[in-house]
Amino acid sequence: MSDEFSLADALPEHSPAKTSAVSNTKPGQPPQGWPGSSPWNNPSAPPSVPSGLPPSATPSTVPFGPAPTGMYPSVPPTGPPPGPPAPFPPSGPSCPPPGGPYPAPTVPGPGPTGPYPTPNMPFPELPRPYGAPTDPAAAGPLGPWGSMSSGPWAPGMGGQYPTPNMPYPSPGPYPAPPPPQAPGAAPPVPWGTVPPGAWGPPAPYPAPTGSYPTPGLYPTPSNPFQVPSGPSGAPPMPGGPHSYH
């Protein structure tokens, strides 16, 4: 008895698996249960290519562009570009320093045009104290009190204030004031004379030409919005008094 054990020895003589294996096998043809040439049973066979792309096509020549890479290919990349982060804040001053002293202007500005022309109207005279001479050359020496002369006063010499153009009232005797009147008495009339005759209007007022109507009850004018009374069977008007039976 042999020590080797085979599957064919364990199956019964009339087993369907054993019968099909024997009956369906033909010389030079592989069994139908196994596929043909594949990388597993034929290492020298070329790998199968998907039917979507030709064998000569490369990812760069695909009309949709190269295949995306990364953890999530469908999401576009966001954020700062790859590389070391920029220093914050940036080094250096916030504004550039000035470039140095500015050069002098090449075109000088307009200078003085010379003496100014004589004005076409005289300047207004400055106010001077009262009594001062109009000509400054004729003014005498000033004393400690401004325009007052330090010397004695001449008879016709003007003082600090001008001579008034209207004489002062004379200090002669004035008429005595009237004596005080008793309360309730009419004061005397100091002007004119009182005309003779009675005081009052020249004639009495004329009487009225007609008498006014006696006040009394007047008829009420007709109301254009008054609703005429209807027959007894007519319905009451809206808003009017209602009779409850």
UniProtKB/Swiss-Prot annotation:
Polar residues bias locations: 17-26
Keywords assigned: Acetylation, Phosphoprotein
Compositional bias per record (Low complexity), positions renumbered to this chain: 34-43
Positions bearing Phosphoserine: S2, S6, S15
Domain of life from the UniProt record: Eukaryota
Keyword Transmembrane helix: no
Annotated region described as Disordered, given as residue ranges: 1-245
Stretches assigned to coiled coil: none
Compositional bias ranges of the Pro residues kind: 44-57, 74-127, 164-190, 198-207
Residues the record lists as N-acetylserine modifications: S2
Family assignment from sequence similarity: Belongs to the MISS family.
Protein name, per record: MAPK-interacting and spindle-stabilizing protein-like
Organism: Macaca fascicularis
Source species taxonomy: Eukaryota, Metazoa, Chordata, Craniata, Vertebrata
